[in-house]
Amino acid sequence: MARTEVVVLGSGFAGLETAFRLRARASEDDVGVTVVSERDDFLFRPGTVRLPFGAAEEPLHVPLHRAFRRRGIATVIATAEGIDLDRGQVHTSRGPMAYDRLVVATGAASRPEEIPGVAEHAHSIATPGALHRLGEDLRWMAQNARHGRAQRVLFALPPGNHCAAPLYELALMLDTWLRRKQIRDNVEIAFDTCEETYVQAFGPKLHALVSRQFEARGIDSRTASTLAEAAERSAVFADGSVREFDVLVAFPPQVASVGYAGLPADDRGFLRCDPDTRAVTGRPEVYAPGDAGDFPLKLGHLALLQADAVAAAIIAHRTGAQLSARRVPVVRHVLDMLDDAAFAQIPLSPGGDPAHVDEASARYWASTSVLWRAGARLAETALSARFRLGLPLRAGRAAFRHGPEITHRNTDTLMEKP
């Protein structure tokens, strides 16, 4: 049987987990894997929320060239420009590449221009550079507060964003940071979200937890409050209310980072996919795990689960094996608050809305502890270490071989264990 050529576009959570999982389950003779990316490292994006408060960026970057070479994965530093579906080729800035199976993991991008004034007057939190600039403004703000000048920081979450949690983290971390500097009394923190409840995608238990945190910390917050326009020092909301600010922080609406003509997508360019395998609708040879797909919640943990499903589908297609029954994923997320953290385990309901929380499940819970923050940092270190070695997050001892895995329980384990 001829070798199956798999081209993976992107080197984020979804792209790397797919590539490394494939290599853990198939030899180079069986499956060729090529990763096409604009960068030669992996960025642990969840950790970038710490950048405005003095954390170093360098530890968040994981070099990949040795991992790719060690695992027999080809890499091309290039930009994806389009797909020729009829010929089975992806066009890149370095030329065309043929594929048997294509994994589109090019992620999401922010579009601040959808809301007048946001691009000009708000700090986005979508990139490390933007978070560094926010940190500079926060330090100026803190200096003003130390000299007795009252300051106002406003956080705003508009519609069209599918990853709300980092904005909540930044607001809570800012409160802790200001208290450490003993200037919290001179800074007003406000939080407006278009959601009906706080961190709505995570259900009522996260809403209750965040509500308690906001109240205890004196953060003036509103739900169902939609940012309509931003000016130099004021924000106008859809209900006509106005908030003044010295620093405005927003997580703008999201769209697909790359548009692909000929592939079905929603109104924001996210590719429509089969919920089980993440195969693009009508194109069984193309997959879209992670943020590039249409799953309405964008999280690193979900990207890893979806990548494992994609790798399993590709291996099953090659071997003729039957795919195991789909398990409804259990989302796990840590909300960093700088001094401690909240941990949430969120089982999603089967059927209907794929991101609907199963509120009746005994596995649905949330709590706050300094231990969760330590655990999150350990998990970050573990993932970075495995990616540095060219290994998927969880693949057992089989990942150290180029041959197929003996066990096939890894994806289920990732879904079910804390």
Where is each model-derived feature located?
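Beta1-alpha1 glycine-rich phosphate/pyrophosphate-binding loop at the start
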Residues: A2-I73, P159-A201
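FAD-binding core/adjacent interface of flavoenzyme oxidoreductases
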Residues: A2-T4, I73-E169, T176-Q182, V249
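N-terminal Rossmann-like dinucleotide/flavin-binding domain of flavoprotein oxidoreductases
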Residues: A24-D100, F202-D220, A398-H408
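A Rossmann-like FAD-binding core segment of flavoenzymes
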Residues: G32, A74-I83, V90, M97, ...
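FAD-site-proximal beta/loop scaffold in flavoenzymes
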Residues: A119-R149, V242-Q306
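FAD-binding beta-loop-beta segment adjacent to the flavin cofactor pocket
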Residues: G269-Y287, M337-H356
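A conserved FAD-binding loop/helix module that cradles the flavin
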Residues: P289-D339
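C-terminal auxiliary extensions adjacent to catalytic cores
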Residues: A344-P418
